[in-house]
Design a protein with these regions (language model features):
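Conserved GNAT acetyl-CoA-binding A-motif
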Residues: 117-119, 146-158
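A short beta-loop-alpha structural element at the N-terminal edge
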Residues: 8-23, 75
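Residue-level recognition of the GNAT/N-acetyltransferase active site
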Residues: 122, 126, 159
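Conserved acetyl-CoA-binding loop-helix of GNAT-fold acetyltransferases
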Residues: 122, 131-145, 167, 171
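Conserved beta-strand in the GNAT
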Residues: 59, 66-75
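C-terminal "cap" of GNAT-fold acetyltransferases
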Residues: 152-163, 171-173, 177-194
Length: 194
């Protein structure tokens, strides 16, 4: 039986974490874990952040310093979307035209929330490390960084079927801003940072 490592600390991302973060991205997805999904999913939902905005990436690492969860953030949605179109979507297209088509549509418009919530985040934690308070600690670390950088708000999308996630974001203080597709959009205001 595999021993579960339950201790975890929050720290800044380092380059040696990249493969672990890609694995967490795949292991925590609701998509079927096919070979194609394992290839394009980290490109779509992980690589931009670790390659272009790593100062906005925090991990929870177990007692062996192996990443078991993360929060990723793009502090500027417009810059994120442009880079996705220029660099990452072409890579995804070579792997899966269907994924490319869906993501292209998702990334093609800047929503009306941009002015108030210019940043967005993704958070994933391996199941064995969930419900331990690590999600809140990851978001705390990110919020502190966003405030330092004078970012006024951050948003995220959570599946409407993810009851634990919905509860977590509400308890943390995120405000429900609306719905899009099968997701609930949450926002967190950091205040005016002049």
């Amino acid at each position: 039986m595999k021993a579960v490592r339950k201790m975890a600390d929050i720290r800044q991302y380092k380059l040696s974490d990249k493969a672990d973060l890609q694995n967490i991205c795949v292991e925590t997805t609701l998509f079927p874990k096919t070979e194609k999904v394992r290839k394009w999913l980290p490109i779509a939902f992980n690589d931009y952040y670790t390659e272009k905005q790593s100062e906005f990436v925090f991990v929870c690492a177990n007692d062996l310093d192996k990443a078991v969860g993360y929060v990723l953030c793009a502090p500027d949605e417009k810059k994120f979307r442009q880079t996705m179109f220029d660099e990452y979507l072409p890579k995804i297209r070579k792997i899966s035209f269907l994924a490319y088509t869906l993501l292209k549509r998702e990334f093609s418009t800047i929503d009306k929330l941009y002015e108030k919530y210019p940043a967005h985040l993704h958070i994933d934690i391996l199941p064995d490390y969930q419900r331990m308070g690590l999600g809140g600690k990851l978001i705390d670390a990110l919020i502190e960084k966003l405030k330092e950088e004078k970012i006024i708000g951050v948003k995220l999308f959570c599946s409407a079927n993810n009851k634990k996630g919905l509860s977590f974001y509400r308890k943390y203080g995120f405000t429900e801003l609306g719905k899009q597709g099968g997701s609930v959009i949450f926002g967190y205001e950091l205040g005016e940072n002049d």
